[in-house]
Amino acid sequence: MFRTAYKTMNQSMVQKFIAGGVGVTGLTASYLLYQDSMTADAMTAAEHGLHPPAYNWPHNGMFETFDHASIRRGFQVYREVCAACHSLDRIAWRNLVGVSHTTSEAKAMAEELEYDDEPDDEGKPRKRPGKLADYIPGPYENEQAARAANQGAYPPDLSLIVKARHGGSDYIFSLLTGYPDEPPAGVVLPEGSNYNPYFPGGAIAMGRVLFDDLVEYEDGTPATTSQMAKDVSTFLNWASEPEHDDRKKWGLKALVVLSSLYLLSIWVKRFKWTPIKNRKFRFDPPKK
């Protein structure tokens, strides 16, 4: 009997020892994984770019629309600065009508450019002035020409750039205004690169492009670096979502109509069911 009790006690001690060892091992592994994750998080800002601050854009409100004067100024910045390297393939001249320009203004800008036309009777290619239906042309014929002109870097199309980047307009504004005079100490950049903390990795082929008074706004707005960055960010946000204003207008209309129908349904329900729910029955037992 004593032998059996001693054997049982030894088995219990072994089980407790194994359980304690497993617990210590698990805690140690968890601590090491936590330290490794902290190291990875510390590298995130350098590897993935500094997170841009959240700016109070006027069009971010639930019932707010774009600042169309800012869209017009932003298109001017794009046309005079950004269009030298970046395309806007998804935007046609007609998209500007009623948003930032009149029909005659958009048509005049389109006619300044030449587009490929149908060949003549002899099969030779012809050129024609642009029309409102034409899309805004890019600066390069193809990707190879773009890379050759930019030391191997390929300038992205800006039609959907706001939707394609985490942070949207905040990222675009921060990137355009985030170039320091000198890179931080210890940062080594590849040849032909520039330092920008908001760009993943910090090394970006595009140098600073916005400087005070670089463009002359038609409405007399001071063309500071931050103002130009704000306007072109607003324009690119509109370019990535041209239906933004109409969507909010239709959403407001739908909200009003559905709310009215909901209130009407409550009234109908009460009108139809109140007599039924308040109906009382009287039971008269049969007389014997």
UniProtKB/Swiss-Prot annotation:
User: What's the top EC group for this one?
Assistant: translocase
Q: Where is this region: Disordered?
A: 111-138
The listed locations are: Mitochondrion inner membrane
Report the record's Gene Ontology biological process terms: mitochondrial electron transport, ubiquinol to cytochrome c
Knockout phenotype, as recorded, reads: Leads to lethality, showing that it is an essential gene.
Q: Where does heme c bind?
A: 82, 85-86
What molecular function terms (GO) are annotated for this protein? electron transfer activity; heme binding; metal ion binding; ubiquinol-cytochrome-c reductase activity
Instruction: Report the InterPro entries cross-referenced here.
Output: Cyt_c-like_dom, Cyt_c-like_dom_sf, Cyt_c1, Cyt_c1_TM_anchor_C
Q: What Pfam families does UniProt report for this protein, alphabetically? A: Cytochrom_C1
Keywords recorded for this protein, A-Z: Electron transport, Heme, Iron, Membrane, Metal-binding, Mitochondrion, Mitochondrion inner membrane, Respiratory chain, Translocase, Transmembrane, Transmembrane helix, Transport
For this UniProt entry, which segments traverse the membrane? 12-34, 250-268
- Say which domain of life the source belongs to: Eukaryota
Q: What is its main location?
A: mitochondrion
Record note on quaternary structure: Component of the ubiquinol-cytochrome c oxidoreductase (cytochrome b-c1 complex, complex III, CIII), a multisubunit enzyme composed of 10 subunits. The complex is composed of 3 respiratory subunits cytochrome b (COB), cytochrome c1 (CYT1) and Rieske protein (RIP1), 2 core protein subunits COR1 and QCR2, and 5 low-molecular weight protein subunits QCR6, QCR7, QCR8, QCR9 and QCR10.
- Name of the protein in question: Cytochrome b-c1 complex catalytic subunit, mitochondrial
Q: Which organism is it from?
A: Candida albicans (strain SC5314 / ATCC MYA-2876) (Yeast)
